[in-house]
Amino acid sequence: MKVIKHLTLFLLLTVTVNAQNIMTSSPYSMFGIGEIVTGLYGSNSAMGGVSTGMRGTWLLNTENPAGLTGLDTLRLFAETSAFMKSESYQSKNGNSNAFTGNMSAFTLAGRIMPHWYMAAGLTPYSSVGYYFQSTEPLEGSPGSYYTSTFEGYGGLSKVYLTNAFMLGKNLSVGVNVSYIFGNTKLTESQSSISVENRMYTHAFYADFGLQYHRQIGKETAFTIGDVYGYKQRLSIENSIAIVYSSSETEESKRNTTQYLPQFAGIGGSLTYKKCTYALDYDFHQYSSLSSGDSRVKFRDSHKLRLGFDYSPNGYSSSSFWKRSSYKAGVNLSTPYLQINGQKGYAYRFSAGMGLPVTNGRINVALYYDKTQLNNDVYGQSTFGMTVTYTLSELFYKLKL
């Protein structure tokens, strides 16, 4: 238990320090509550992030909290994730490139009592991170120009407590109770003056999950599940600061209204011999968010996720490669941003491996992400990697 204890203390400190760090470089993260963070953590990142119908003895599935009941009943788990990615942005106003990386999540999970499982953790919810400059002619002074600098950083983090219960041999339910919080700062600077828009956001939230799992013979099992989260108003405190070269004036602004969007999803997985196939469908009502700019609107998003896992011989094999697992996945979705009336499409391809290590597993995923709006209004291409380390230690000497 000492390994889990020391790792937990270190990672909680590390992830807390990094919770507000930049996880995106998109200029459109300035709108709403920032860019929604997805696909940057979890051992199933290589499978396209499928989760609704997924469960396993080493799978810390809090996306569908009911899936937590599939964990090994004798073990305590600690899991942390990190990522790095190279992003490229294209629009009619120009192109830009950026590289980002960070710790992205931490989870601690295990069984508390027979039929009762719990998890606690910290993950990012949204991120703001951009920097660009604009040069315009100075009115009334032909041949003269002024430069404006736009910069923003911050975002929202989610700390959560998950409870999952087995209602019978095949049926499980779960709930995530979360506190979402964070600060963002958006700055526009010209010469010796800058204007900072500051926003502090927080809210309590809950989402729910259900799974039905059934074993058919020795080599076949299937799981179906669904998830739901309601629309929740965010508490927001706005202020504006005007900063001169040697002074600063701050005053409160009229508070804006933003919401955590309602979402629902359904999914399933089928395990036959050494292979697992999974399919998820998700709906997020992002249209409840406000951008504050008439040119940029949020629209509802639909996402289809497919995942595949091949595990040759599981944990019992003496061969390292046969104890490894091989994963791939694909996402197809409608982007939640609409710019100048233009909609578009998004897709993601991912592949990776789950590697056995002493007292744990390391899951590595490589992915390519593409978002494109019509008429080349906006495009984003991302190539990245996520690494998730799951550590496990025996918690009970005897099964309860």
Where are these regions (language model features)?
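Subset of outer-membrane beta-barrel
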Residues: 20-400
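Basic side chains
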Residues: 2-5, 327
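Sec-dependent N-terminal signal peptides
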Residues: 4-15
